[in-house]
């Protein structure tokens, strides 16, 4: 029993250390021109550093194009330690994109994947 308690504590502590080691990128690091892609559709978007609210920045892009790729067209964005969230005006999430090397990916309910990649 003692070994189980020690193992549980070590697991909890190491998990906490790993989570706290993720760095939150700044808006300036992520701002700029990006491409949102689906299987056959691509939309150019711009992640701006203009503040929409306290923790969300403005996103600019073709609304009609974005609505074809996501459940609704986002108007804002915010960085997270493990990804990037596109948001509505009130800050609620439209889609969370998890970081995958040099791009960010979001899986829709139907299983299709959307990719965000920063233009060079």
Swiss-Prot record:
Keywords assigned by UniProt, alphabetized: Disulfide bond, Metalloenzyme inhibitor, Metalloprotease inhibitor, Periplasm, Protease inhibitor, Signal
Location of this chain's protein in the cell: Periplasm
GO cellular component: periplasmic space
Record-annotated disulphide pairs: 43-65
Record-level Gene Ontology MF annotations: metalloendopeptidase inhibitor activity
Main location: periplasm
Leader sequence residues: 1-19
Family to which this protein belongs: Belongs to the protease inhibitor I38 family.
Function recorded in the entry: Inhibitor of the extracellular proteases A, B, and C of E.chrysanthemi and the S.marcescens 50 kDa extracellular protease. It forms a non-covalent bond with the proteases and may prevent autocatalytic cleavage of the proteases zymogen in the periplasm.
Description of how the protein assembles with itself and partners: Monomer.
Full protein name: Proteinase inhibitor
Organism annotation: Dickeya chrysanthemi (Pectobacterium chrysanthemi)
Organism placement in taxonomy: Bacteria, Pseudomonadati, Pseudomonadota, Gammaproteobacteria, Enterobacterales
